[in-house]
């Protein structure tokens, strides 16, 4: 499945705009605290454990969005947006959304 932040896919014609699709992942109660504690693990200016958890949450949200698109018989998603939010103390949410299309 093609997933892009752009509104078009170069070299492809969008046959049908189907619906808005989204996916969310919330990292639980101790994740944010543990991640900040792991900042001590900074190597070369980057916090490896923190980046790993963000990537995991983003991957979960993206897969959920793709699943919803497939259920609607889409074969691509355009115009995706990725947002990161602290929903309350100790909880991080990654939300992705886009438009499911058929090319």
From Swiss-Prot:
Domain of life, source organism: Bacteria
SUPFAM superfamilies, per the entry: YbjQ-like
Signal peptide bounds: none
Family the entry assigns: Belongs to the UPF0145 family.
Name used for this protein in its record: UPF0145 protein BCE_5284
Species of origin: Bacillus cereus (strain ATCC 10987 / NRS 248)
Taxonomic lineage of the native organism: Bacteria, Bacillati, Bacillota, Bacilli, Bacillales
């Amino acid at each position: 499945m093609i997933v892009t932040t752009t509104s078009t896919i170069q070299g492809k014609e969008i046959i049908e705009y189907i619906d808005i699709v989204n996916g969310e992942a919330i990292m639980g109660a101790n994740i944010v605290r543990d991640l900040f504690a792991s900042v001590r693990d900074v190597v070369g200016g980057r916090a490896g454990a923190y980046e790993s958890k963000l990537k995991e949450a983003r991957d979960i949200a993206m897969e959920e969005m793709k699943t919803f698109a497939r259920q609607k018989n889409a074969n691509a998603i355009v115009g995706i947006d990725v947002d990161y939010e602290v929903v309350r103390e100790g909880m991080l949410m990654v939300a992705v959304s886009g438009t499911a299309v058929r090319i």
